[in-house]
Regions:
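Aromatic-anchored, glycine/proline-accented short structural segments
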Residues: 1-18
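Adenosine-phosphate binding glycine-rich loop
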Residues: 14-111
Length: 112
């Protein structure tokens, strides 16, 4: 997964090579001409139909990644608190469906 969090941190070719392209909301993303999806659209590398909106993934209207080999390009925009809220919802849905893998990020956290 490649997550583009600013206007110029991704080459447009990353979008073209992705098997799944995800953004928060297409109308918001496509209006920012310096962002990777808008540049890929202008270059004819993708169409609107190639892009999945995050709400469609969360609501289950799009299956998302269908194999471990797929490359995902994600371009979240907005406030970090929105990302936390979306992540919490995705986590609860994955937990409900019995999906995902629990990761141990630290063996002995230094802050506890």
């Amino acid at each position: 997964m490649f997550c583009s969090v600013s206007s110029l941190d991704a080459e447009v070719a990353c979008v073209e090579r992705a098997d799944l392209v995800v953004c928060d909301l297409w109308d918001h993303e496509s209006g920012h001409h310096s962002r990777p999806l808008a540049r890929a659209l202008a270059a004819g590398m993708i169409t609107r139909e190639d892009v999945v909106e995050l709400p469609d993934l969360v609501a289950g209207r799009h299956p998302g990644r269908t194999s471990d080999d797929q490359r995902i390009f994600s371009t979240p925009v907005g406030l970090a608190i929105e990302d936390v809220a979306a992540a919490a919802r995705v986590y609860r849905k994955a937990e409900e469906l019995g999906l995902g893998t629990e990761l141990s990020l630290w063996r002995n956290p230094i802050w506890t």
